[in-house]
Design a protein with these regions (language model features):
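Long, contiguous binding/interaction regions
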Residues: 2-95
Length: 95
């Protein structure tokens, strides 16, 4: 089978419907083994929240995670992953 490379990155979540917060937290909990850091900033005045997640996992699994979050009404998701998991020392050795 094809081995998927583990990568690091972030997932940004904008929840414009705080009534969906429990669903967002449920999905994050289902993928908690990938989440290495989390910050959540609620804005009760506007009825929204922004969540930043640091993640580590293969691109297919991160895609499944962001897809599940993005399917929640009122939730927008963007993500970025490092192109590879090689360290700067490993890259220097290749030169």
């Amino acid at each position: 089978t094809l081995h998927m490379e583990e990568r690091v990155g972030f997932v940004g979540v904008v929840n414009e419907d705080l009534s969906q917060a429990a669903r967002v937290n449920q999905v994050v909990g289902q993928f908690q083994d990938m989440v290495t850091g989390r910050i959540g900033v609620p804005d009760h005045e506007r009825g929204m929240a922004v969540i930043g997640l640091l993640v580590r996992g293969d691109s297919a699994r991160v895609g499944a995670f962001t897809g599940r979050l993005g399917n929640i009404p009122g939730v927008q998701v963007k993500s970025a992953l490092a192109k590879s998991n090689t360290t700067s020392n490993e890259r220097k050795q290749d030169i």
